[in-house]
Amino acid sequence: MITRGIKIDDLPTFDIEYLFLNIRAKSVGEDINVVVTCPDDKETEVPVTIYVDEIKVVKSKEHKKDIVLDKDMTLRMKYPSLNQFIENNFDVDDRSKTTVDKTFQLVADCMDTVFTKEDAWDSEDYSPEERLQFIEQLSSKQFKEVEKFFATMPKLSHTIEVTNPNTKKKSSVVLEGLVDFFG
């Protein structure tokens, strides 16, 4: 689907979540009622109202798109699109792939450019198999750096304060991703 020059299918998942949240706000209302479990006793549930305009896409300070693999090579990553997310999480046609296979495939799909001091290689110039081979040859230390890219990438986030009615203890609760807001 293309809308005014924007390919919706290629947008990062966090942009899609933000758009979905705002479309929902315009159609159903600006406030969302959620039930939060109090962190102090992990059992008391408290209803909370959140206003959509308070929910933001948050980017971690530790987040980097450029991952230094060694002194001579840097890997630039791109965010997973909605299509990539769906293919890697809901592909019912390929049940033979393990979680590890799907993780490696997602990482390979999110490669953008590989840089050395002399050259740069655009990942689109290489087949999916070649990109996968590149990812598979990373050391565990290098792969952990790539994992940080995904762990720290932007996401919908909102912190709320709740008071447990039983213990009167105040706690902060962080809600992240659509599941926390609509789950």
Label each PLM-derived region with a short phrase.
Residues 1-183:
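Long C-terminal interaction/binding lobes of large macromolecular proteins
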